[in-house]
Amino acid sequence: MKKLLIGTALATSVAASAFAGGHGKEVTIGVFLGFTGPIESMVAEMGPGAEFAISEVNESGALLDSAKVTAVRADTTCIDSGAAQAAIERLITADGVDGVVGGDCSGVTGAALMNVALPNGMVMVSPSATSPGLSHNNNEDKGLFFRTAPSDARQGVVMTEVLMDQGIKSVAVTYTNNDYGKGLADAFQSAYEAAGGTITINAPHEEGKADYSSEVAALASAGGERLVVAGYVDQGGGAIIQASLDSGAFDT
């Protein structure tokens, strides 16, 4: 239920912050995403999307009796937890944000949440951090963290259902070696094996290589009717799929 009340949670947090001290007409939202780094191409759409939503709120005048909402950007980098923590700390202490849209990649999101946002009582709403470790079933997040993308635990089940519906009983798996990739690969393996499927290999891959032919050869030698890739399209995922198709190692 908590995840279904994301809009209410953010609005409540923003309202409490905005009206504290008599500042009922101004709201500042941090847009905390990987404007640089391995998912820069995705964030090129995500960031403006958040800002467009804010502009619609301002035009409607429906939030907090026509409060003016301002967006302030900060860069998670996706991969550098230290930089991400420094960035969200600036949003909170220097920019005085009332809420944060972000982070994006699971590792930096978790670090920013636990080490900076929670101690400062700051709400975060992530559009893309999917690690099962961020579910916080024991209220470790104190009710301050929400996400609009489903956990990898759910994604692993859906991937399994798709493959089983196609009669695919064995697959090779490769994943980008970070919290996101490993979390998704592990969730998929658990669900797929529970459904009777066989994982022939579950191996990490390095991001951003020019050539993945050796990785594809190793995956193919392990066998499997299909190849499952848990990774970023621009940082190896797409290249692995293309190399698999080009070599004929996997046809889908």
What are these regions (language model features)?
Residues 26-45, 104, 170-174:
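Short beta-strand segments enriched in small/hydrophobic residues
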Residues 97-202, 252:
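Extracytoplasmic ligand/sensor domains, especially the bilobed periplasmic-binding protein
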Residues 1-28, 59:
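Short, low-complexity disordered leader/linker segments with a strong preference
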Residues 22, 41-48, 61-136, 148, ...:
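Beta-alpha junction/loop-to-helix N-cap segments that form part of ligand/metal-binding clefts
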